Amino acid sequence: MDASESQVVVSSSSRGRDADIVSWQALSEEAYKAFERKRYVQAEERFQDALKLAEGLTTAKHAAKAASPEDRQDFERLTKSLNNLAALYHLQGKYEMAEAMYDRCLDLKLDLYGDDHLEVAVNLHNLAALQCAKLRWEKAEILYTRALEIREKHLGNEHADLMPILKNYAIMLRKIKRDDEAQAMEERKSRIESLVAAAK
C-alpha cells in the first residue's frame, strides 16, 4: 500500500501539531489535484483524511472561544475541509451529505466570525446553490439575498465579487419564471463587469 493511502488519523497530541498541519496541507493538495482530474473517489478519500486531521486539531476546543491565532487557524482549516467535502458531494449529486457539511461549516464560521462576515457570505452562497439543486427556491432566495447583502456591505455595490451571486441568483429567477427580476440582476452584473474591465 502506498504510504499516502495508509492510516493517517493519529491524534494531534501524539504526532505534534506541526506535523498534523503539514499532513493536512499535503492531503488537501492531493485531493485538489484528484478533483481537477475528475478522480472523485480519490479526492473524497483525501478530503476525508484531511477533515479527520482538522477535527483532531480542534478537539476539546470551541470555535466561539478560539482566542489565539493558532486556535483560529485550526478552525479555519476545519471549515476549509468541510467546505471541500461539501463541494465534492454537491458536484456528485449527494445533496444531503453536501448540505450536512455546508451547515456544519456555516455554524463554525458563525462562531468564528459572527453573522456579518465575508466568509459567512461564501457559505451562504454555496448553500443557496445547493438549495437550487434541490428545487428549494424560497430557501435559496433567502440565502442568495443574505449573501449579497453581506458582500455589498463590505465591498460596495460595484465590486467584482458580487457577480457570481448575481449570476446564480438570476439563473434561479429564470427557472421560477421571474424574468423581470432576473433581467435586472443580469443587467447589474453586466454593469459591474464593464466597470471592472474599464478599471484594468
Which residues does each predicted region cover?
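Intrinsic-disorder-linked linear interaction elements in eukaryotic regulatory proteins
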Residues: 1-200
